[in-house]
Amino acid sequence: MSSENLPPDVIKRVVKELKELNSSTLEGITLLPCEEDITNIEAVVTGPAGTPYEGGYFKARLILSSDFPRSPPKANFITKIFHPNVSKKGEICVNTLKKDWTEDLGLKHILLTIKCLLIVPNAESSLNEDASRLLLENYDDYCKHAKLFTSIHASKPIIDSNNNNENSTTTPTTTTTATTPSTNTASISSPVKKKTETTNSTTTKVQPKKSLKRL
């Protein structure tokens, strides 16, 4: 959807929020602004330390509807992730974007909520039954699967030119090499909530060390 479909006051609000996000520092979140279409917002969420997503770079997308902010934006991960609240197509299920949505909630709040979802998954709002089951029944196995997905799909840092090609990603202009997250789950405690991606990067491609079994 083009930003032309948004009312002028909403466009002004979104532009202001995007400028504030660009000028501020959100730990673990990097905005990838698109000047051509402010209704298509992308950001990279860095996997939080102490979680099975640590060391990963996950591109997320927010799509603003024509009646935003009366209706919440649609959110999805472009980067593949093994998470109970994220479907295999990348759709994100979080209460902030559903029953808890209010018009005064801003883009910053939404992005922080998505990051927090990587820290405290909610097994009850499940979009991935396999991930939800492992989270509840065998947290160590859940961590192993999540870390494997992270090492395969999210181990390389992301900078996007903000076109609409989901596969058009490059590594950032730094010499730091992405590392594969450790598979040691002993130090990670279960955060289950119940009831309730200057120089070009190296040309060496990271290949997964083992194949992913079909869940």
Curated annotation (Swiss-Prot):
Residues 161-190 have a biased composition (Low complexity). GO terms for molecular function: ATP binding; ubiquitin conjugating enzyme activity. Keywords: ATP-binding, Cell cycle, Cell division, Nucleotide-binding, Transferase, Ubl conjugation pathway. It is an enzyme of class 2 (transferase). One of its GO terms (cellular component) is nucleus. Coiled coil: none annotated. SMART domains: UBCc. The keyword Cell division applies. Pathway: Protein modification; protein ubiquitination. It holds the Pfam family UQ_con. It catalyses: S-ubiquitinyl-[E1 ubiquitin-activating enzyme]-L-cysteine + [E2 ubiquitin-conjugating enzyme]-L-cysteine = [E1 ubiquitin-activating enzyme]-L-cysteine + S-ubiquitinyl-[E2 ubiquitin-conjugating enzyme]-L-cysteine. Residues 9-155 form the UBC core domain. Its EC number is 2.3.2.23. InterPro entries: Ub_conjugating_enzyme, UBQ-conjugat_E2_core, UBQ-conjugating_AS, UBQ-conjugating_enzyme/RWD. The active site is at C93 (glycyl thioester intermediate). Residues 159-215 are annotated as: Disordered. GO terms for biological process: cell division; protein polyubiquitination; ubiquitin-dependent protein catabolic process. Belongs to the ubiquitin-conjugating enzyme family. Catalyzes the covalent attachment of ubiquitin to other proteins. Acts as an essential factor of the anaphase promoting complex/cyclosome (APC/C), a cell cycle-regulated ubiquitin ligase that controls progression through mitosis. Acts by specifically elongating polyubiquitin chains initiated by the E2 enzyme ubch10 on APC/C substrates, enhancing the degradation of APC/C substrates by the proteasome and promoting mitotic exit. This is Ubiquitin-conjugating enzyme E2 S. It comes from Dictyostelium discoideum (Social amoeba).
